[in-house]
Amino acid sequence: AVAEAHVPRSIRFKTKPQIALEQIRAAIKANVAPGTVLMDASYGTNSGLRRAITGLGRSYVAAIISTVKVRLVRENDPKPKRVSVGALARSLPKHAWRTITWREGSNAKLRSRFARVRVRAAPIRGEARFAEETLLIEWPTDESAPTKFWLATVDHDMPFRELVDLAKLRWRI
């Protein structure tokens, strides 16, 4: 089938995350100004890709799916239990949520309800421990459950609105 399609023998199959990582490495090699890597959930859910981007010295804001497992970072709990980001979001107290407006839309200001917490991606047994990250969660008031989740390695002190704006920036590309 490959020969019939006239695909050169030198071309090998690569996953989308592998291709993305090659593109990021090429940008670094070409001295493209460093910025935060933005990923949708098809890329962001891949822990290997996130780890590789961190290894290249780049920060990211990566959309993930609700079943991704994390451990909540707490000072008094050295080994918190693994929990899905969806379950963690539903367990947060009311005061953890803030309504944030991130930009003007075509008809109105874009706003929703968000929470952010410090987590570590919960590694698969035997995998090296992940660094602390920010979990950003969106739960619009008119929804029965949280709708969007991101893991971010940006500066922990980044203003909340700025973090939301960065997460939502991917939609403008």
Regions inferred by a protein language model and the residue ranges of each:
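Polybasic low-complexity intrinsically disordered regions
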Residues: 1-66, 76-77, 151
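Intrinsically disordered or highly flexible coil/loop and linker segments, enriched in small
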Residues: 33, 172-173
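An anionic, glycine-rich sequence signature occurring as long contiguous blocks
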Residues: 1-13, 61-172
